[in-house]
């Protein structure tokens, strides 16, 4: 072979009847199907040149002006952002707005903390905010709203689900119509409400309405601070009271009711049992 030509004559591509596909073989192999030959070395060389070209472009590109498509709008002087959709608006560096009347505005100089809004009417208007869904609203730093009409309106609040609302700092509302309306509150389940600071409501329509209250179970209800209600339709309605079991009820301060249909009515009362066991003021009832 002559120097410079050997690489172009070592391999070729032929049709393999047994494998029913093209295969790479030695130049010396016979091709029974025809005369067409593809030079592998040339293809590899072309790919190498193309890849090198892409790398050079990426390295040279740097920051680019924000882009608008389909009548979207971008704020002058902002870079690397994107607005797609009629009246979509990207108003800060690297922020992304996709959807009719969506708005993404990180309201921060730091381009590493962009906002992202996706969905008709979605608004993400704080640093590192994310709003995803029809009319989803994430309006404070690091807030996340996912779901139709979901709202996360305080720092680091998280709302996930249709009409879910997290309106306290670091609050979490997960589930359709779930509401966490105080700092560090957690509501998990359809229609749950955690209204007290650091309160927890878990289960369909469970409620925790005071500081550090815990309501777990369908329709569990806690109205006073540090109260605990666990079980379907259980109820804690005094400070520090505990009700555990279906339809159990603790209505006196520091009272404890454990068991189905048990009731602790008075301060410091303890009722343990089933089917209507009741403890009065300071008393203990077991049965």
What are these regions (language model features)?
Residues 1-6:
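Short, Lys/Arg-enriched N-terminal segments with co-localized hydrophobic residues
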Residues 10, 15-19, 23-30, 37-47, ...:
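Glycine- and small/polar-enriched repetitive beta-structure motifs of secreted/surface proteins
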